A protein has these predicted regions:
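Cross-family detector of peptidyl-prolyl cis-trans isomerase
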Residues: 18-307
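Bacterial Sec-dependent N-terminal signal peptides
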Residues: 1-25
């Protein structure tokens, strides 16, 4: 019993000492990046971008469950450089190769929210396009609103912006320390959160594949091999071959991934929503000379207004 009480006392002292170490910080999850130029204190957005924050934290603490075996069990960011620095724009790091093309061995989806690149000190994910996040991140020197909707903002500098502004190319990340203040931050399990993201993504992928398989089996096929299913029947007139029609669309890969859509709700459901583009029906002609994909035109000719 004395042993148990001693362990409990040690735990309480540890929690209190963590709180006293950074008394100026409000409750939340923080990352202190120690660089060759000084320290940068960042607050991470675990409520709005839990997956991106979990990725960063688990890499920093060395318990990310998805990293390439070469990085397994290692504090990923220690010793890496800021490989890309652009004056009056941003500093970028997190690439183990130092070239801008390296990563942890996996990619994950964007978490686009109302968080904006609205000033200096914004922490955001570098990427090579939609759904290509890995380990590379950048911190802004100034407002960069053209990046909104394209890069996931997941934190901000609360102390050390002068250090950010002083960073030069090839300066080093010495260490990244994660600081948990308050109950919610302490119970945020980054490794488990990130692992569960991939498990759920796999489950959704399997569900989509099964749904597509069922759809193929119930489809009606034309002589050309086009398969179609009318899920909702309208009461309008048939599509006329000599007229322009307005139509919504959603195009998928065979494995169930979304390629493109004109429907906002579908774009959001597949985490491909782009606030910079309109979501509205497109005009289409279905005659033989129209510059549309043949199968798309054939499918439209089988429909009526409202289908």
């Amino acid at each position: 019993m004395k042993k148990i009480n001693l362990l409990a006392l040690i735990f309480i002292i540890f929690i209190l000492s963590c709180g006293q170490q950074y008394p100026e910080l409000d409750n939340g999850l923080y990352a202190k990046i120690k660089t060759s130029r000084g320290d940068i204190m960042l607050q991470l957005e675990i409520d709005k971008t839990p997956i991106t924050a979990a990725n960063f934290v688990s890499l920093a603490e060395g318990n990310n469950p998805k990293v390439n075996t070469a990085f397994s069990g290692k504090k990923y960011y220690e010793g890496l450089i800021f490989h890309r620095v652009i004056k009056d724009f941003m500093i970028q790091g997190g690439d183990p190769t130092g070239t801008g093309s390296g990563g942890p061995g996996y990619q994950f989806d964007d978490e686009i929210t109302d968080l904006s690149h609205n000033g200096p000190g914004i922490l955001s994910m570098a990427n090579a396009g939609p759904r290509t996040n890995g380990s590379q991140f950048f911190i802004t020197h100034k407002e960069t609103p053209w990046l909104d909707g394209k890069h996931t903002v997941f934190g901000r500098v609360i102390e050390g912006q002068s250090v950010v502004d002083s960073i030069a190319q090839n300066d080093t990340i010495i260490a990244v320390h994660i600081i948990r203040k308050g109950k919610e931050a302490r119970k945020f399990d980054a490794a488990t959160t990130f692992e569960n993201y991939f498990l759920e993504k796999g489950r959704v992928k399997n569900d989509k594949r099964d749904a597509l398989s069922a759809l193929e089996q119930s489809a009606t096929y034309t002589e050309s091999g086009l398969g179609y299913v009318i899920t909702t029947e309208g009461d309008g007139e048939a599509v006329a071959i000599d007229k322009t029609v307005l139509t919504h669309y959603a195009v998928y890969f065979e494995d169930g991934r979304l390629l493109d859509t004109s429907i906002e709700d579908i774009a959001k459901a597949y985490k491909m929503y782009n606030s910079k583009r309109p979501y509205q029906p497109i005009p289409a002609r279905v005659d033989s000379d129209a510059g549309m994909i043949a199968g798309f035109k054939e499918g439209l000719r089988l429909l009526s207004v409202g289908d």
